[in-house]
UniProtKB/Swiss-Prot annotation:
It catalyses: D-glyceraldehyde 3-phosphate + phosphate + NAD(+) = (2R)-3-phospho-glyceroyl phosphate + NADH + H(+). GO terms for biological process: glucose metabolic process; glycolytic process. PROSITE patterns: GAPDH (PS00071). Belongs to the glyceraldehyde-3-phosphate dehydrogenase family. This is Glyceraldehyde-3-phosphate dehydrogenase 3. GO terms for molecular function: glyceraldehyde-3-phosphate dehydrogenase (NAD+) (phosphorylating) activity; NAD binding; NADP binding. NAD(+) binds at S13, H14, D35, R80, N317. It is an enzyme of class 1 (oxidoreductase). D-glyceraldehyde 3-phosphate binds at S151, C152, T153, T182, T211, G212, R234. It is found in: Cytoplasm.
Length: 339
């Protein structure tokens, strides 16, 4: 089987998980990593130990200036300017842009100067086309050189919203994500001029925050453009988040009918492994390490009337999202004829 030679720019946040996910996907081979702020020895440490997901079960070391994972050597660079990263010299045709800095088409296109042929941004983008696995991959065309995998929350919300809209029609809706702490937050109160609440201590507060995840669904499902918006609450847990989608339906349905529809969709070829379904009495830690984008919690939702319903879906905002980035990469490469 042929493999996709891949580069990663930014070895922080969820990217140790993405590298781990790539090891499980025989179609993807990471050949180079760039991060100007992390030295090689620390990179080994970050990959080996994780407070939430535990120790890496394989082998990781550094040798001759390279990161070696399960015996596989990965070149490491420390360039600040994406245009200076020599992706081409490593045969890395595809690059995952994960710094959270170069999120526009223009900024991410700098990787093309170093020899990359395609860039996948692991964050929402203001102008790059966004794709969500299981939702709108049919819209991808090979002429696109910079694309976005949207956000972890959009990846949770969009599959659920698509199933509901396709079967019952969504007239309008509000989304709230109860979101685990992320590395951008403050451990204790500190300066945050643009977001005063965001400057408060993450471990001591439930923090209301903004999110563009619901509006972004309108970009991947155009029929829902302008019909959804939302907000977030940041909570002091290390991983796993949950979406609360409250919608007004066009077609009346009982909650049991809605559950059955979602369960059937979760077993379909299109959404199997993407949208999960559970009737267990679960809590957030039950989903640590879950690779689904979205796991519908049938016991947590409620209904006020046949056209007004609240739906709940969980997601591992680290591991689940990282898995989807690798899946998107493999899909795109297949469509490009690289596999």
């Amino acid at each position: 089987m042929s493999t996709i030679n891949t580069g990663i720019n930014g070895f922080r946040s969820h990217w140790p998980y993405c590298l781990a996910c790539s090891l499980e996907n025989p179609k993807v081979k990471v050949v180079a990593i760039n991060d100007p702020f992390i030295d090689l020895e620390y990179m080994v440490y970050m990959f080996k130990y994780d407070s939430t997901h535990g120790r890496f079960k394989g082998t990781v070391e550094h040798k001759d200036g390279k990161l070696v994972v399960n015996g596989h050597e990965i070149a490491v660079h420390a360039e600040r300017d994406p245009a200076q990263i020599p992706w081409g010299s490593h045969g890395a045709d595809y690059v995952i842009e994960s710094t959270g800095v170069f999120t526009t088409k223009d900024a991410a296109s700098a990787h093309l100067k170093g020899g990359a042929k395609k860039v996948i941004i692991s964050a929402p983008s203001a102008d790059a086309p966004m794709f969500v696995v299981g939702v709108n991959l049919d819209k991808y065309t090979s002429d696109l050189t910079v694309i976005s995998n949207a956000s972890c929350t959009t990846n949770c919300l969009a599959p659920l919203a698509k199933v509901i809209h396709d079967n019952y029609g969504i007239l309008e809706g509000l989304m709230t994500t109860v979101h685990a702490t992320t590395a951008t937050q403050k451990t204790v109160d500190g300066p945050s001029n643009k977001d005063w609440r965001g400057g408060r201590g993450a471990g001591a507060n439930i923090i209301p925050s903004s999110t563009g995840a619901a509006k972004a669904v309108g970009k991947v499902i155009p029929e829902l453009n302008g019909k959804l918006t939302g907000m977030a609450f940041r909570v002091p847990t290390p991983d796993v988040s949950v979406v609360d989608l409250t919608v007004r339906l066009e077609k009346p349905a009982s909650y049991d009918e809605i559950k059955a529809t979602i369960k059937k969709a979760s077993e379909s070829e299109e959404l199997k492994g993407i949208l999960g379904y559970t009737e267990d009495q679960v809590v957030s830690t039950d989903f640590v390490g879950d690779a689904h984008s979205s796991i519908f919690d049938a016991k947590a939702g409620i209904q006020l009337s046949p056209t007004f319903v609240k739906l709940i879906s969980w997601y591992d905002n680290e591991f689940g999202y990282s898995t989807r980035v690798v899946d998107l990469l493999a899909y795109v490469a297949g469509k490009d004829g690289a596999l």
